[in-house]
């Protein structure tokens, strides 16, 4: 296990909140060995608002390591140049069933920055193109979109365009159609751009969606239908759009209890399931078949999950395990949810720890979680970043996973 933290000092303010954060962090470190196969912490000079594992990796069987790459950004608050950063690290294979051997082997998971690409403002999100991972898009604090070639020598963007008039966080490459890029912004719009029609000076904007009445916080492509995408906004709406009929959404969901909806994720396993992360700290599970075409209607809500204590910032379904969802929040927590446990009966002592679908809580960050990413080639492995300048890379422990399997077997036996 690697715990290579450079934890920033909390300062001399004796407020109850800071003392609580410090004590919680120390307790988390103490219990890491019981929860993780490995966990590493790396301090950055500036916080990163974005993280994503790149699919490129190299396995070293002899050393029991995987050479991995990550995308990070910077948020310098105007005090320094902002960059898209390409980072390298090593993570363990964790194939050994010998716990003592695993715990005694040193793993150097310190993140190293191997390339930097300049950007005009803080990078809110950076994502690689699925069909060509060497091409990366970013959206920044001015709503500007930049494309970079990770494999080239150019240290600046290969394309720069300004479809928005304000800060933006929504950024999603189509998994179906090469070059199709969705962006969403505080200017209340979602824009679809065809980056494959790039020449030296021009990008082709396919269409702009202007239905939302407030800040659009996120937009994501559907995992099964190449024509569908979803968007969420401070106007409390989730909209499902069809790019073949631009204009009004084909269906919608209204969330009256929340101050807004911050993020969404479509399931890669169930074509009708979408999760939304809300400003009121809850997560909504929706059935897209049951959504309404009318305004101010909440049809389609399957279940509400409660476990966070502050606004949801990021949401992503596992690419490996059906029904496993990760959420990050302003409350400094990252929660893994097992949707197959929704509605299970609980003993009273278990219910006090949370709802049955709350699978695990990662409590190692000392600042608001800004983004998370499932590793695409290694089960149960996640990268997460927070505004405390710390990057966490971690894999859920086999002990925890086996304990869950044991419970399932016991229930089966009882039936």
Curated annotation (Swiss-Prot):
<feature type="repeat" description="WD 2">
    <location>
        <begin position="163"/>
        <end position="203"/>
    </location>
</feature>
<feature type="repeat" description="WD 4">
    <location>
        <begin position="256"/>
        <end position="296"/>
    </location>
</feature>
<dbReference type="InterPro" id="IPR022052">
    <property type="entry name" value="Histone-bd_RBBP4-like_N"/>
</dbReference>
<keyword id="KW-0156">Chromatin regulator</keyword>
<feature type="repeat" description="WD 3">
    <location>
        <begin position="211"/>
        <end position="251"/>
    </location>
</feature>
<dbReference type="GO" id="GO:0006325">
    <property type="term" value="P:chromatin organization"/>
</dbReference>
<feature type="repeat" description="WD 5">
    <location>
        <begin position="307"/>
        <end position="347"/>
    </location>
</feature>
<keyword id="KW-0677">Repeat</keyword>
<dbReference type="GO" id="GO:0005634">
    <property type="term" value="C:nucleus"/>
</dbReference>
<keyword id="KW-0963">Cytoplasm</keyword>
<dbReference type="InterPro" id="IPR050459">
    <property type="entry name" value="WD_repeat_RBAP46/RBAP48/MSI1"/>
</dbReference>
<keyword id="KW-0853">WD repeat</keyword>
<feature type="repeat" description="WD 1">
    <location>
        <begin position="118"/>
        <end position="158"/>
    </location>
</feature>
<dbReference type="Pfam" id="PF00400">
    <property type="entry name" value="WD40"/>
</dbReference>
<comment type="function">
    <text>Regulatory subunit of the histone acetylase B (HAT-B) complex. The complex acetylates 'Lys-12' of histone H4 which is required for telomeric silencing.</text>
</comment>
<feature type="site" description="Important for interaction with HAT1">
    <location>
        <position position="273"/>
    </location>
</feature>
<dbReference type="InterPro" id="IPR019775">
    <property type="entry name" value="WD40_repeat_CS"/>
</dbReference>
<dbReference type="Pfam" id="PF12265">
    <property type="entry name" value="CAF1C_H4-bd"/>
</dbReference>
<feature type="repeat" description="WD 6">
    <location>
        <begin position="364"/>
        <end position="404"/>
    </location>
</feature>
<dbReference type="InterPro" id="IPR001680">
    <property type="entry name" value="WD40_rpt"/>
</dbReference>
<comment type="subunit">
    <text>Component of the HAT-B complex composed of at least HAT1 and HAT2. The HAT-B complex binds to histone H4 tail.</text>
</comment>
<comment type="similarity">
    <text>Belongs to the WD repeat RBAP46/RBAP48/MSI1 family.</text>
</comment>
<dbReference type="InterPro" id="IPR036322">
    <property type="entry name" value="WD40_repeat_dom_sf"/>
</dbReference>
<dbReference type="InterPro" id="IPR015943">
    <property type="entry name" value="WD40/YVTN_repeat-like_dom_sf"/>
</dbReference>
<keyword id="KW-0539">Nucleus</keyword>
<feature type="region of interest" description="Interaction with the histone H4 N-terminus">
    <location>
        <begin position="349"/>
        <end position="353"/>
    </location>
</feature>
<dbReference type="GO" id="GO:0005737">
    <property type="term" value="C:cytoplasm"/>
</dbReference>
<protein>
    <recommendedName>
        <fullName>Histone acetyltransferase type B subunit 2</fullName>
    </recommendedName>
</protein>
